[in-house]
């Protein structure tokens, strides 16, 4: 799923340029743009359109890390 792939890349909390996201996820640039704009609209990521960069919103990042941790504990 493109959204999950992009969120996994953004989990480091740093700013990423769409071109970098496209290269690392092998997703088409139009899909990266569509997904990042959707995520920004609902405040899952911060989108700096002037600088053309995106990063995950800290509360979203904490939530995703907690979910992953719970999933890992369940699988143990």
PLM-predicted stretches and their roles:
Residues 10-13:
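Short helix-capping/hinge SLiMs at alpha-helix to coil transitions
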Residues 21, 33, 50-51:
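Short loop/turn and capping residues at structural boundaries
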Residues 1-3, 17, 49-73:
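Short, cationic-aromatic polyanion-contact patches
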Residues 15-24:
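Short acidic, hydrophobic short linear motifs in intrinsically disordered regions
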Residues 40-51:
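A short, conserved structural fragment
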Residues 27-41:
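Short amphipathic alpha-helical interaction segments
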């Amino acid at each position: 799923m493109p959204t999950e792939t992009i969120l996994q890349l953004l989990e480091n909390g740093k700013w990423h340029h769409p071109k970098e996201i496209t290269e690392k996820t092998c997703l088409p640039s139009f899909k990266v743009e569509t997904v990042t704009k959707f995520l920004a609209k609902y405040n899952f990521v911060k989108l700096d359109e002037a600088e053309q960069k995106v990063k995950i919103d800290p509360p979203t990042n904490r939530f995703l890390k907690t979910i992953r941790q719970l999933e890992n504990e369940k699988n143990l």
